[in-house]
């Protein structure tokens, strides 16, 4: 009984930032972005109506993290969350439809993140997008939309919540002078969430970065070139990570967090036999930190 995958993310953005984020996802990352009547931007990486949604709002913030669960596990996981002293609210049909979900249960954690346990509604395939992104359920396992690195006040308590309540496993730990991060998995993706204590100038409740995974190295290289061509800031140059072996770069998104686009992430074939790793550097090569251009 555990979360299956990171199914969707909802961000609120100021109007000017929302338009800039559309450029990030559509013109740099290569996703499909559709607009609805309310001015929201729906970012598609596969056939689901959205994997990332950008809602107009007064501030830039992560509004909801959608955790996909099996229908048979929803009530039990929600009960476990309640036992961990978090109040769980069953969303009505209108909110579930807004999330393109069959059922949704919400709770907020101590760092201010809103989590949504949801049962997926059926959606069509999209062969074009599915040829571009590692997302959702693939032939070799479940991967979800990508991974999220967040800043938390009490890392040990938060890690325990993810592992003991939501059913995640510890992938590895990377410790270097600037940060100390724990990486957690819930499926074949090396990590779906990573937890950091306050570091790198970030405070609890903030997002360090969102990672999306391309299916070709060329996609990453083209996106890296597009960042520069379109005048956005590179946060870290192309490099390869030590723990999940991803080839990637990071750009600084206008919404106040980084977006990583990677290729070739390590796959966890057998969750039961995974051995936790420990690393003293986040990258094997590259990923050189860049000063903002403006």
Curated annotation (Swiss-Prot):
Keywords recorded for this protein, A-Z: Aromatic hydrocarbons catabolism, Dioxygenase, Iron, Metal-binding, Oxidoreductase, Repeat
Example GO BP: dibenzofuran catabolic process
Molecular-function annotations in GO: dioxygenase activity; ferrous iron binding
Gene3D superfamilies (UniProt xref): 2,3-Dihydroxybiphenyl 1,2-Dioxygenase, domain 1
Positions bound to Fe cation: 147, 209, 260
EC number: 1.13.11.-
Membrane spanning residue stretches: none
Subunit structure: Monomer.
Protein name per the record: 2,2',3-trihydroxybiphenyl dioxygenase
